[in-house]
From Swiss-Prot:
This is Sulfurtransferase TusE. Its EC number is 2.8.1.-. It is an enzyme of class 2 (transferase). GO terms for cellular component: cytoplasm. It comes from Yersinia pseudotuberculosis serotype I (strain IP32953). Belongs to the DsrC/TusE family. The keyword Amino-acid biosynthesis does not apply. It is found in: Cytoplasm. It holds the Pfam family DsrC. The keyword RNA-binding does not apply.
Length: 108
């Protein structure tokens, strides 16, 4: 894909091949490809998965994401129903893609 005059390499599923190519300016473009318009709740999850990746060097699968979100933000946001409303095709897959991170290992 081309963004701001340079080529950004992605895999066949649209995940960035190099997470250092990511920027907050690129996130809305990636979200649009997923049919998502980013709102503040989306950004909260995107920033959360980026912080998770930086701390643990892995993208969180859905169970891990729900548990970690519940610990940080409480049950209201740390549940799969809330996350699926934001990311209908799979919170772990879509949030990590929009965050410019590798696909979670346990996602098909």
């Amino acid at each position: 894909m081309e963004f701001e005059g340079r080529i950004i390499d992605t895999d066949a599923q649209g995940y960035l091949k190099n997470s250092t190519d990511w920027s907050e300016a690129l996130a809305p473009v990636l979200a649009e490809q997923e049919g998502i318009t980013l709102t503040e709740p989306h950004w909260e999850v995107v920033r959360f998965v980026r912080a998770f990746y930086q701390e643990f060097n892995t993208s969180p699968a859905i169970r891990m994401l729900v548990k970690a979100m519940a610990q940080k933000y409480g049950e209201e946001k740390g549940n799969s129903r809330y996350l699926y409303r934001l990311f209908p095709k799979g919170p772990a897959k879509q949030a990590t893609k929009i965050a410019g991170l590798p696909k979670p290992v346990k996602c098909i």
